[in-house]
Amino acid sequence: MCRKTKSAIHRRDRCFVEGWRTVVKTKSHYDSPLGGITLIADETALLGLWFDWQPGYADDDSAVLGDSPTIGAAKRWLDEYFAGCIPRTEVPLRLEGTPFRKEAWALLRKVPYGETVSYGGLARRLELKRADGRRVSARAIGGAVHRNPIALIVPCHRVVGADGSLTGYAGGIETKIRLLQLEGVLKQTERTDVDCESIDRIWRSTR
């Protein structure tokens, strides 16, 4: 058991203390068609999801390797997504960042599957949402998108340049192309029809 020392990390037991509450974080891996994905969650929410080769995403050594209900839900979401289905599984998220980044990520989550938005378009949506009318630059939105800690579920791959160009994806442009092909935004040479209902039935039968 971790000693309840405020803000301390007790690495042997792979847990940490937030205030006076002991929090256990779990880390797991997922093999996607595009490569390995790392997931990190605490007892109540998903904290991180990224492709293993993304720069700036170091493993959290306070997390124990394993699975949890939250990570299980995230893996089910990924199964549905990579099968070419619009995911129906709800995954609780906790996005840590500045107030501005949280605003941008909240709007980003509303960009539908199979659609894209420009950095400038996302900036205008945020301006309209704000009561004070403060201007938001496309560059600031780009910074928030680049620092998104939960890829795919918070769909930063759906943000494109003003001219529709595929720019600025932390997972790499080739990955962005593959994701947008999967969603039908970009044409691909071959697509296999998938029975999304069967994916759901398989998950239910293994619970």
Predicted regions and their residues:
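Intrinsic-disorder-associated, low-complexity terminal segments enriched in Asp/Asn/His/Tyr and depleted
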Residues: 10-13
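Compact structured core domains
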Residues: 41-90
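Structural motif
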Residues: 36, 45-46, 158
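DNA-contacting interfaces and partner/effector-binding or oligomerization modules
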Residues: 19-41
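Detector for intrinsically disordered, low-structure N-terminal pre-sequences
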Residues: 16, 22-23, 63, 193
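Nucleic acid-binding interface residues in structured DNA/RNA-binding domains
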Residues: 26-33, 85-207
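Ala/Thr-enriched low-complexity intrinsically disordered regions
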Residues: 5-8, 22
